[in-house]
Amino acid sequence: MKALSKLKAEVGIWMTDVPAPELGHNDLLIKIRKTAICGTDMHIYNWDEWAQKTIPVPMVVGHEYVGEVVAVGQEVRGFAVGDRVSGEGHITCGHCRNCRAGRTHLCRNTIGVGVNRPGSFAEYLVIPAFNAFKLPDNIPDELAAIFDPFGNAVHTALSFDLVGEDVLITGAGPIGIMAAAVCRHVGARHVVITDVNEYRLELARKMGATRAVNVSKEKLADVMSALGMTEGFDVGLEMSGVPSAFQDMIDKMNHGGKIAMLGIPPSTMAIDWNKVIFKGLFIKGIYGREMFETWYKMASLIQSGLDLTPIITHHFHIDDFQQGFEAMGSGKSGKVILSWDK
């Protein structure tokens, strides 16, 4: 079958011909319809330090997808050939303390689809049936293909009560932008998102951000004043991994504020812990999606009218994958969809 693989320990990704995956007793075989390029895929493409330490070569990559079930393992219940599915990209062990307690998103033995095992940039994918999510008919393929990153946004944004709250989001990548849309949809008062990329700040405006602030040109304190804010933000969503952005967030949080962190900062990042302590801030780390509460919430948000379509800015056939990666790497894109349909 055709598949995009990391074949060499260098920059790039290659179209290859690999054997189709084998179906296990508890697995689904999925024929891929559409995939999306993730920031993780860009790390793998660019072969940065994280990728060099993490990705075995060769490896079929990709983990954002939608497809159709074409075969079902003999022990599987609840799925049938013809079902349209997306899937959770974190394969969990099922026997650690967190898995047994129903907190599978915190499994210490997680294996990543397209990272530690063959991924979805292929004609066919095998995953455990436990990881598949059957899609409602009224959610189109292109939205289903981005459920993985949308789930990151939903998990982060819905970590805290948002109704009537003032929210600061640092980092206007696709996940940060989708988080802004979620915050507005569920009833936040002001949703302010910061970045230095004008293209993506404009996308954030289209997706409902109250203010999209280029912090290289405008002071966040001035924006807060213009919005009539006098006490700081109630909720912070850190999506950038940029130390200066996180420090700015801590400075602008109200006393008792709550921060959810999805962005990955340098391990040596220093912050003013005095402000964390004396403001009584709550900081929560976010990894992946809650299984499967986040997935149910994603479907419900879209079915209740949340419009994610502006975040999808580019479509390519899989044969033109190189153009897709170039678009994603340009900084002038939202989500990039690769279609596997003939």
Curated annotation (Swiss-Prot):
List the active-site residues: T40, H43
Q: What is its main location?
A: cytoplasm
Q: Which GO terms describe its cellular component?
A: cytoplasm
> For this protein, what is any one GO molecular function term?
L-threonine 3-dehydrogenase activity
Q: Does the keyword Metal-binding apply?
A: yes
Output the superkingdom of the source species. Bacteria
Q: How is the cofactor bound?
A: Binds 2 Zn(2+) ions per subunit.
EC identifiers of the protein: 1.1.1.103
Q: Which InterPro entries match?
A: ADH-like_C, ADH-like_N, ADH_Zn_CS, GroES-like_sf, L-Threonine_3-DHase, NAD(P)-bd_dom_sf, PKS_ER, Zn_alcohol_dh
Residues bound to NAD(+) are: I175, D195, R200, L262, G263, I264, I286, Y287
Has keyword Methyltransferase? no
Pfam families in UniProt: ADH_N, ADH_zinc_N
Q: Which SMART domains match?
A: PKS_ER
Localized where? Answer: Cytoplasm
What are its cofactors? Zn(2+)
Residues where Zn(2+) 2 binds: C93, C96, C99, C107
Q: Where are the residues marked Important for catalytic activity for the proton relay mechanism but does not participate directly in the coordination of zinc atom as a site?
A: D148
Q: Which reaction does it catalyse?
A: L-threonine + NAD(+) = (2S)-2-amino-3-oxobutanoate + NADH + H(+)
EC primary class: oxidoreductase
GO annotations under biological process?
L-threonine catabolic process to glycine
- The residues the record assigns to binding Zn(2+) 1 are C38, H63, E64
Q: Which HAMAP family match?
A: Thr_dehydrog
Q: What does this protein do?
A: Catalyzes the NAD(+)-dependent oxidation of L-threonine to 2-amino-3-ketobutyrate.
Family classification: Belongs to the zinc-containing alcohol dehydrogenase family.
Name the record gives this protein: L-threonine 3-dehydrogenase
Natural source organism: Aeromonas salmonicida (strain A449)
